[in-house]
């Protein structure tokens, strides 16, 4: 049984299930309550009224840039810049943003936070009380400053180096080192630069202010940014505020295009023995790469059906291995299959198999190959398929609103962010569109989630 053979199997199972669900090449229904627009400077905005919770709103600014945009002498500065956004801006010097918001009951680390990944940087203020109009204007001014007015004063930069060093230390573990070895294999042959977000300790300790400002001025610009505001307010009035407040932000002259990176497919089967002498665990991981739909296809019903089907396959295969590991003679204590999107051009299907006791790595390989061969020859049983489908639907029930009135701000925000960064559909439960994403389940032959 070859890995190539199993890659073909996974694709074949997906095609079989996909074909059995009335294939359609139509866009997903769009939530008509979302106001999406683009300012003259290229900044995108998403606005939606939602009264759950009543009297509150979420405010986000999404930057379609991350560690991948760093030059070699800026390794780690995308993440460092995220920290500096809370250490002084034009209208909120030093810790002004945190002090101002916490005085109004909006807590740092809980309601106020941010994250940096390899491809994006997102700042947000959640569950902000809409006490008065002037306060809302001040919160929008925070987003405005995060767009183009982060100060990066020298003293604040120097003070923050120690904070970043400690974060670097806590992220340096056997697991993280093996993960980096793993990524080197997965990204081999691709155009992605080698970045790990936390960056190089040498850069963190020694970069000059001009270097972080170079990154900031080059990449923090409105044509790579989106404002997302969802909550209990008048949506048209909020749109007017955003147009008034954010239209003055300018792009730099001669904007450098953001490069689109692609993963390279595996050209042959390979085995890598990844060892860290400090690691106290053993695992067999098998990765398969498969084509991921282009951005233009990610708001289609067919795309969401494919995600649903991949979840079913993963759940069925994982459940089968769960039954096998109950035997005391099984060399594995746990076996799991997941299918992840790289958000670029390829899926990763991943099998993780953990040993029982002192079982040898070769016995785990045999366990994987036996399962792969059985799937290739016989596929899934009807009971396995139906049980996995039920599990996936129950999970969707758990993580999706069961009525238009129960959808929360964060659920809507997540869809807007995904639309901006990855081209996902703007589909949510609303009075005008009660089916939303659940049209996928109906098309796949399963009742919709609503009672």
Description of each model-found segment:
Residues 256-320, 352, 409-426, 430:
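His/Glu-based metal-binding/catalytic segments typifying zinc-dependent metallopeptidases
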Residues 226-282, 390-400:
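An aromatic/glycine/proline-enriched structural segment found at the starts
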Residues 55, 63-177, 191, 196, ...:
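Active-site-adjacent, His/Asp/Glu-enriched structural segments that form or flank metal-binding
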């Amino acid at each position: 049984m070859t890995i190539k053979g199993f890659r073909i199997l996974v694709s074949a199972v997906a095609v079989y299930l996909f074909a059995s669900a009335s294939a359609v090449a139509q866009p997903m229904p769009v939530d008509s309550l979302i106001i999406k627009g683009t300012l003259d400077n290229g900044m995108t905005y998403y606005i939606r009224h939602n009264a759950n919770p009543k009297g509150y709103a979420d405010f986000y600014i999404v930057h379609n840039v991350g560690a991948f945009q760093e030059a070699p002498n800026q390794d780690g500065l995308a993440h460092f810049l995220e920290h500096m956004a809370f250490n002084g801006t034009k209208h909120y010097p030093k810790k002004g943003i945190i002090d101002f918001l916490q005085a109004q009951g909006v807590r740092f680390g809980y309601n106020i936070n941010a994250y940096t990944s390899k491809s994006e940087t997102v700042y947000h203020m959640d569950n902000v009380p809409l006490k008065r109009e002037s306060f809302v204007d001040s919160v929008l001014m925070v987003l405005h400053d995060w767009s183009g007015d982060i100060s990066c004063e020298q003293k604040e930069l120097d003070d923050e180096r120690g904070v970043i060093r400690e974060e670097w230390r806590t992220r340096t573990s056997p697991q993280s080192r093996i993960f980096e070895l793993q990524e080197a294999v997965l990204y081999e042959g691709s155009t992605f630069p080698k970045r790990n977000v936390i960056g190089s300790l040498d850069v963190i300790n020694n970069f000059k202010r001009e270097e972080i400002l170079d990154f900031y001025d080059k990449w923090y610009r409105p044509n790579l940014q989106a404002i997302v505001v969802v909550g209990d307010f008048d949506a048209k009035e909020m749109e007017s505020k955003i147009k008034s407040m954010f239209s003055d932000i300018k792009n730099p002259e001669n904007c450098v295009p953001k490069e689109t990176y692609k993963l390279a497919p595996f050209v042959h089967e390979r085995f890598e023995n990844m060892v860290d002498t400090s690691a106290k665990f053993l695992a067999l991981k098998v990765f398969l790469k498969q084509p991921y739909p282009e951005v233009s296809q990610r708001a289609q019903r067919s795309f969401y059906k494919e995600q649903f089907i991949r979840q079913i396959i993963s759940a069925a295969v994982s459940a089968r291995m769960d039954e096998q590991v109950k035997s005391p003679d099984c060399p594995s204590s746990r076996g799991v299959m997941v299918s992840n999107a790289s958000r670029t051009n390829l899926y990763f299907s991943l099998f993780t198999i953990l040993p029982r006791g002192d079982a040898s790595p070769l016995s785990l390989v045999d366990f994987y190959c036996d399962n792969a061969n059985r799937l290739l020859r016989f596929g899934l049983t009807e009971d396995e398929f139906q049980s996995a489908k039920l599990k996936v639907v129950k999970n969707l029930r758990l993580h999706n609103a069961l009525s238009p009135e129960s959808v929360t701000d964060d659920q809507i925000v997540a869809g807007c962010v995904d639309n901006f960064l990855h081209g996902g559909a703007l589909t949510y439960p609303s009075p005008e569109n009660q089916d939303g994403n659940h049209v996928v389940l109906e098309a796949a032959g399963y009742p919709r989630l609503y009672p």
